A protein has these predicted regions:
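N-terminal signal peptide c-region/cleavage motif recognized by signal peptidases
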Residues: 15-17
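Compact alpha-helical subdomains of small soluble proteins
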Residues: 27-28, 64-133
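Bacterial N-terminal signal peptides that target proteins for export
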Residues: 1-7
Length: 133
């Protein structure tokens, strides 16, 4: 990927609402002043909740909640200058390993709602701002 494309993608991820594959867009929290260590801890939590809620039917999320979680993780990755490969390796690799633990769904799944509330308290939201036509 050309450097200008990478910079453009990073700018898009760091500004405005996030758009889900289904066309749902939600406002993302302001993470611009978050220290790197705190951002990485939040990214780990976001990846774990994303993997568990996507793979454990009892804890499935709606499109708006999912978009808030994934959009925030993407924004933080861009903020920290992580490539897609580094982001997957550092955060999603360990999160997917949780699926080997039969207790992971019931341990991580209930943390989704408090995480979403935390993101809302930081300025994020789950009310769609646009929808696909």
């Amino acid at each position: 990927m050309k450097p200008t494309h990478t910079a453009l993608i990073a700018m898009l991820l760091m500004s405005g609402p996030a758009l889900a594959d289904g066309g749902v867009s939600v406002p993302l929290p302001d993470t611009s002043g978050m220290p790197a260590a705190e951002a990485k801890a939040l990214m780990s939590e976001l990846a774990q909740v994303n993997v568990i809620t996507s793979n454990c039917p009892d804890y499935a999320l709606d499109d708006e909640d999912w978009t808030l979680i994934t959009g925030t993780g993407d924004r933080l990755a861009a903020q920290l200058g992580l490539s897609a490969g580094d982001y997957d390796r550092e955060f999603y690799g360990p999160a997917f390993k949780l699926l080997d633990d039969p207790q992971a769904c019931d341990r991580i799944g209930p943390t989704a709602a408090p995480l979403i509330e935390r993101l809302k308290s930081m300025g994020g939201g789950t009310t769609p701002t646009t929808a696909s036509q």
